[in-house]
């Protein structure tokens, strides 16, 4: 929106006594400034004042036991190492907590896993040592530097060393990390993966794709698990003792029995032994917290606090062994199991699933018995939100900033349908919404599985929540999701009933589930949970505009001076020839990245076997096989992730229009303009990463005409078939190409079309594009969002463009919209927001999410981050604190089209 138009709107609003320089205060006031409980607010303050901390306690005990168990069966050896690590975790209970335990001994933080990937720590070892040697200094300047990033420790200070641009580690622990990392050189999943990848004849191509950021990162050793839905059924139904007894009985039945396959039948014995070892470690971990709570009770003088510690002791001692009896016990157990799951591996996106339906049995029975009130439930859910927000994922700076933006994608799905096709909404899900409105934290993000059968008041409640500006719930088309389940998993026996059990894994990965029959106090309930492999551990983020760049540059990356692909040496005389070379390069990229990823994940499943997640999900316990042996019910989950789709579409449209249809410019003139960035500085030099505030250096006007023509060329998002058909043709082709790819489980793959935060770094690695985007600026976000400022014909024209193709045949698509808060003010505004959402989903859109925020607020927050510690925005499938986002993503969010009328 132009400054003059924005000023005019602002003056009109102010004339009516409506202030527009806010995020969502008008909408907040509608709901009487909903606030969290005093207890939750106090603990949220603890979170705000806590830095992300990395420590070596868990890895130390893991590594020590792993060495000690050398020579044992790999899966049992790993189980013993995990058992030792969990058993030795130092308990830490913050005063006022009713839900306890966390990833480490620190309130917020994580730990490195050099057995998965150690090269970063080895490479940075000397630098970290030097940082640790520096004299301690606690200057205000240093505090300000890392404070501006919220909980991120972006620079070293005092006795704290910054690692990966996010975590702080005490300097005395740094030598332990470096020493341990060196022990894993040549033996980690990462190093073994590199060793065997090099045996591929086209390994050099794979390395070129990685070094030029055409592919964002290797998933096999970076984030091998996650972007999936956890399953809490077995602990909730049987208790931990019950699972141990089950494993012991199964162990007796399978010992020495090959069961006819001659390959993995014998592995069942070792898997069941590993299950027993790990659960014993988890029980010790829980009971250590119970002992700590008992100690705190003994020294507490306040009678109310003393009673709370006593309650914690009883809860923890019970759930360490038995099925939970109450809602609070069930909530504590599911949270504990969740932390255990994400501590097992380098994981982001271990999503919670249909939580309101999973915990409903305990909620229903406690309410009926008068054991708990709705307000008490809401407070517990507020506390749960804070605990989930405390989860950090330890990864390299590139992954943390360039993909995760500090988020861990623990998505909670609401709505959808039950097994019998009736509405999945219930009273507990309404309370989950209420808790998220009162206690606005980035985690867990909510996703509404929209279905026409859901009650209107439930949907209105969700729309009210969205209006508050937290970015959630996002809205997903339940019908599309079940259709995709049936298509992708038909060969593995997917039924319509089972398809209804799906939920969102990670930020937006449609993930298969199943129904299990849970019995509580003699009453049986059907609950959903995850039943599939990682739905996001395939080829990680192909940069679509970068592939097109290399088509134009004959396979060469001029920024890096690397010949990535073999030169095609074609004159590109026709548009069809451009498309032909693009498809060839794209298929080459998928093929080599898919095979390299298969090698990495194969090594991961052999040496870093998942035990906790395996024992949780059907049908591993029934089969006696872990995830690596396809113990899960659904295994065709690995995908090909892409980024920058609309930037690519707009670029193709510009080439077609300007070079081949109108013949206004030659392909050589376009290439020259791109190499010279249309006469502008690179965004990296300027320090601004949207198209705003870029600096022109060419004074001759040589590129003015071609630059204007590129900007004026047809753009996606305006219901213009010239551009939109390019998207349609690409989507049809991409789906077929991905199905030709094969994961290590010999299953077909599929497209995953989300940007997360990759449109920032991948945009930074890309020259100017034919659509007029300048070098180093971010790509378009999502996959069907319009490029910032190019959707000129309103939101409904954008919806027409987005639904020109069948979005139900792929895992997902992503639509981000930014609305001015006054646009949806009041009850009518809530209805308007719901109608807007419905209109898109009814047209076949898969996903839509909103930022309800004034751009001026974001600009001020960028300049004065300390004044906006609690400000949250929706990025691309997830919500994050504004001050913890990198500037490229901040610039992109600010630049998004802001709709004042819908």
Curated annotation (Swiss-Prot):
Report the GO molecular function annotations.
4-hydroxyphenylacetate decarboxylase activity
Instruction: Describe activation and inhibition of this protein.
Output: Enzyme activity catalyzed by the HPA decarboxylase complex is rapidly and irreversibly inactivated by oxygen. Competitively inhibited by p-hydroxyphenylacetamide. Not inhibited by m- or o-hydroxyphenyl-acetate, p-hydroxybenzoate or p-hydroxyphenylpropionate.
Fetch the PROSITE patterns from UniProt.
GLY_RADICAL_2, PFL
For this protein, what reaction is catalysed? 4-hydroxyphenylacetate + H(+) = 4-methylphenol + CO2; 3,4-dihydroxyphenylacetate + H(+) = 4-methylcatechol + CO2; 2-hydroxy-2-(4-hydroxyphenyl)acetate + H(+) = 4-hydroxybenzyl alcohol + CO2
Pfam families reported for this sequence: Gly_radical, PFL-like
Tell me which residues make up the PFL domain.
Answer: 38-774
Gene3D superfamilies with a match to the protein in the record: 3.20.70.20
Q: Which residues carry this modification: Glycine radical?
A: 877
The EC category is lyase
| GO cellular component terms given for this protein | cytosol
Q: Which InterPro entries match?
A: Gly_radical (IPR001150), GRE (IPR051215), PFL_dom (IPR004184)
Q: Which residues form the Glycine radical domain?
A: 782-902
Which keywords accompany this UniProt record? Answer: Lyase, Organic radical, Phosphoprotein
The entry describes the temperature dependence as follows: Has a half-life of 15 minutes at 30 degrees Celsius.
> So what EC number does this one have?
4.1.1.83
**Residues involved in 4-hydroxyphenylacetate binding:** 348, 507, 540, 641
- Explain the post-translational modification: Phosphorylated on serine. Phosphorylation may trigger the formation of the active heterooctamers and thereby regulates enzyme activity. Requires the activating protein HpdA to generate the key active site glycyl radical that is involved in catalysis.
Where do transmembrane segments lie in this chain?
none
- What superkingdom heads the lineage? Bacteria
Which NCBIfam families is this protein grouped with?
glycyl_HPDL_Lrg
Q: Which family does it belong to?
A: Belongs to the glycyl radical enzyme (GRE) family. HPAD subfamily.
Q: What does this protein do?
A: Glycyl radical subunit of the HPA decarboxylase that decarboxylates phenylacetates with a hydroxyl group in the p-position. Active toward 4-hydroxyphenylacetate, 3,4-dihydroxyphenylacetate and to a lesser extent p-hydroxymandelate (2-hydroxy-2-(4-hydroxyphenyl)acetate), forming 4-methylphenol, 4-methylcatechol and 4-hydroxybenzylalcohol, respectively. Is likely involved in the catabolism of aromatic amino acids such as tyrosine fermentation.
> What is the protein's quaternary organization?
Heterooctamer consisting of 4 large (HpdB) subunits and 4 small (HpdC) subunits. Also forms a catalytically inactive homodimer.
Please give the name of this protein. Answer: 4-hydroxyphenylacetate decarboxylase glycyl radical subunit
| Origin species | Clostridioides difficile (Peptoclostridium difficile)
